[in-house]
């Protein structure tokens, strides 16, 4: 449900756009990527490890998947997104977001579903304050950055989700693992 509503309502994917998905092989990320492909996007997944990336490409149908543990992850992301990033589905935060930020296109959309990299944080990470850069980028590039709480924001649309997602699963367009 978060994948469906966050991507379709906030991300608003259009054919030919580049969608980057963090936590690409988790339940939400895997679904986001597959819906992105159904909508005609070029999908770049980000996952932790070669096996997860292989799964994203071979089973889920992503175009590319990058291992965020790689020393040159940021450089790989630049190469994987030669036309920039139109949608970044945020599940993680941290260094993945830092690598994505400079690649965002004008009018990019960022549905914020989670920030797993900072769930247990009790203080800000060391280093420079990145908020001014984030806000300047959001302003200059007119980026839509929107968090959402699925039950509160979209609970009333559960039947829409069940109908369309049920059809996609029935037609074998969306794959999932329990």
Question: Model-derived features: where do they sit?
Answer:
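Glycine-rich phosphate-binding loop and adjacent beta-alpha segment
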Residues: 95-174
């Amino acid at each position: 449900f978060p994948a469906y509503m966050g991507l379709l309502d906030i991300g608003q994917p259009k054919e030919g756009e580049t969608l980057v998905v963090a936590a690409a092989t988790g339940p939400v990320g895997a679904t986001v990527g597959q819906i992105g492909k159904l909508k005609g996007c070029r999908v770049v997944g980000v996952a932790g490890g070669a096996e997860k990336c292989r799964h994203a490409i071979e089973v889920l149908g992503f175009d590319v998947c990058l291992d965020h543990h790689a020393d040159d992850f940021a450089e790989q992301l630049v190469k994987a997104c030669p036309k920039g990033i139109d949608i970044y589905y945020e599940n993680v935060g941290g260094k993945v977001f830092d690598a994505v930020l400079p690649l965002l296109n004008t009018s990019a959309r960022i549905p914020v579903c989670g920030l797993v990299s900072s769930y247990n944080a009790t203080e800000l990470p060391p280093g420079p304050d990145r908020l001014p850069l984030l806000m300047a980028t959001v302003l200059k590039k007119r980026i839509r950055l929107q968090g959402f709480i699925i039950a509160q924001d979209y609970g009333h649309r559960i039947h829409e989700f069940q109908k369309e997602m049920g059809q996609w699963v029935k037609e074998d367009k969306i794959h999932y693992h329990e």
